[in-house]
């Protein structure tokens, strides 16, 4: 499953939810119509809902969920993440990756295993991989100057600059 967006607010009087897209690609949301998605809160609470309408207006995205017909019903869902099945995830271009799928990949250099990706985070428009090496943790910028080949079959990520692990 992939996170596709976050509920920001209610919209209108018919129970639409205003959504922030994680990928900024609204077109892929059209495929959610008549499909079930999982709404998850950071505390672990989750509910499954069916998307019955997708609306894009003025660079904003709105979803209507089955059984939610008033703004008051949307308000408790604000902040929930919208998770979708892998088959409904946005398509990727060459060289693009779902960061969540990189968790568990092994960091390598010259075929030597160095550590494992345990998390990622974004800060000031940059993505960092959190890498565990022994009992220490390091943050590696997800930039081509530091990161080389990513092998999905072997689940490895080449680290070009070893000094990042000191």
UniProtKB/Swiss-Prot annotation:
GO biological process terms on file: ribosomal small subunit biogenesis; rRNA processing
Signal peptide boundaries: none
UniProt-listed SUPFAM superfamilies: PRC-barrel domain, Translation proteins
Domain PRC barrel, residue spans: 94-165
Main localization of the protein described in the UniProt heading: cytoplasm
Localization annotation: Cytoplasm
Residue intervals passing through the bilayer: none
InterPro entries, per the entry: PRC_barrel-like_sf, PRC_RimM, RimM, RimM_N, RimM_N_sf, Transl_B-barrel_sf
Keywords, in A-Z order: Chaperone, Cytoplasm, Ribosome biogenesis, rRNA processing
The keyword Cell wall biogenesis/degradation belongs to this UniProt entry's keyword annotation: no
One Gene Ontology term, aspect cellular component: cytoplasm
GO molecular function, one term: ribosome binding
Family that this chain belongs to: Belongs to the RimM family.
PANTHER family: RIBOSOME MATURATION FACTOR RIMM (PTHR33692:SF1)
Subunit text: Binds ribosomal protein uS19.
Domain notes from UniProt: The PRC barrel domain binds ribosomal protein uS19.
Free-text function comment from the UniProt entry: An accessory protein needed during the final step in the assembly of 30S ribosomal subunit, possibly for assembly of the head region. Essential for efficient processing of 16S rRNA. May be needed both before and after RbfA during the maturation of 16S rRNA. It has affinity for free ribosomal 30S subunits but not for 70S ribosomes.
Protein name as annotated: Ribosome maturation factor RimM
Organism taxonomic ancestry: Bacteria, Pseudomonadati, Spirochaetota, Spirochaetia, Spirochaetales
